Amino acid sequence: MFACATAKDFQTLMICRFFAGIFASCPLAVVGGAFADIFGNETRGIAIAAFSAMVFLGPFISPIVGGFITQSYLGWRWAEYTTGIMGALALFLDAIFLEETYMKTILRKRASHIRAETHNYAIHHISEEEILDLGSLIHKQLLLPLKLLFLEPIVFLITVYTAFIYGILYLFLEAYPIVFSEYRGISPALGTLPYIGLIVGVLLGCGTVIAFEPRYNRKLKENNGIPVPEERLLPMMIGAVVFPIGLFWFAWTGNYPSIHWIVPTLSGLATGAAILTIFLQALNYLVDAYLTVAASAIAANTFLRSFFGAGFRGLPFHLRRFRITDSPLLALFATAMFHNLGVDWAGSVLGFLAVAFMPIPFLFYVFGERLRKLSRFAPTDIGAGAREKSEQKDDEEKRQPR
């Protein structure tokens, strides 16, 4: 990001942002597996709720901060410097406090430490016997996420849904300036303040998910501590219903400057809450359903939704000084759609798509366990079926003579 801030031309800026995007994708890709390692079934939901809230608050807060920075004497370069400074701070904190979470790696390091102390070189972890070759590396890191994405109905549909949600998140970064700055004549900096509606909505969604955690933990206790993935879908079902309502609300109130700006701003309460509940519980569901390959399932999800996020996003406001915004490659999806169709019908198209996606969490709540039983990757000893097996085992033990 520091290189982006000092770029002299657009080509240099794009190359630097390309590498920034590659390295910035790491936390999003591995967080599911890391949280599966760190947190137990009772606390993982709250941890992912906090993480997801930050994921969505960032894009909504940054236009406000960036808008005022770029409109001040600091200029657009300090928007890049600010991001770089925050990234450097995160690197510093990670280097001090973040430790390895993957059990195989931890045990390998422990075995190596014992060998160094005892000089008994026969001590080793079984994973050290594995020969790391290029083929297995490609299979695990590249092919496995793609297999999960295209061979697992749960991963595919949840990923497509969250990719759409993620795209809408970045689409709002284009739609809000059109509604509030272009249509209503509000200055670019002040025109970012309606994002506060989305910010409050995200916080409401996070609170909704956390409110369902006691219910999930009761189900978890009834299931002998074994995850019940489908119970994660209840807040997602609420979000799936609320989301199209928020989109239609924004579309048909934002299109008319005669309607007070607070009305489309308040639609952010619905869309923000829905975005958070859908995205968050989708991640929780994938982690619970695919515990042993959770990182690969999340990587597949991150891969596809990042494409949607890039495709729905136009050129950031502070980069339009390079005077290349007429390029269809850079306008991509959002700007062209809202200018050609109008806010009302562009938002309605997205609302109808949200209605089409609405049944997904309801279908998996009913049929998810059956699909997981047919899966080659999802553990079969989780969910309601595991509870039945556990109860049968307890009954058999009671019937055995003592």
Q: How would you name each of these model-derived features?
A:
Residues 4-12, 23, 39-41, 74, ...:
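Helix-breaking motifs and short loop linkers at transmembrane-helix boundaries and internal kinks
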Residues 12-26, 34, 233-281:
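Hydrophobic core of transmembrane alpha-helices in multi-pass small-molecule transporters
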Residues 16-56:
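Cytoplasmic helix-loop-helix junction between adjacent transmembrane helices
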Residues 25-40, 277-290, 294, 300:
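Intracellular juxtamembrane helix-capping segments at the cytosolic ends
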Residues 43-73, 78-90, 201-208, 304-312, ...:
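Glycine-rich segments within core transmembrane alpha-helices of 12-TM secondary carriers
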Residues 65-74, 97, 180-181, 213, ...:
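Interfacial helix-cap and linker-helix signal at transmembrane-aqueous boundaries
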Residues 77-78, 86, 91-140, 200, ...:
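Intracellular terminal tails of multi-pass secondary transporters
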Residues 140-206, 276-284, 313:
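Extracytoplasmic gate region of multi-pass secondary transporters
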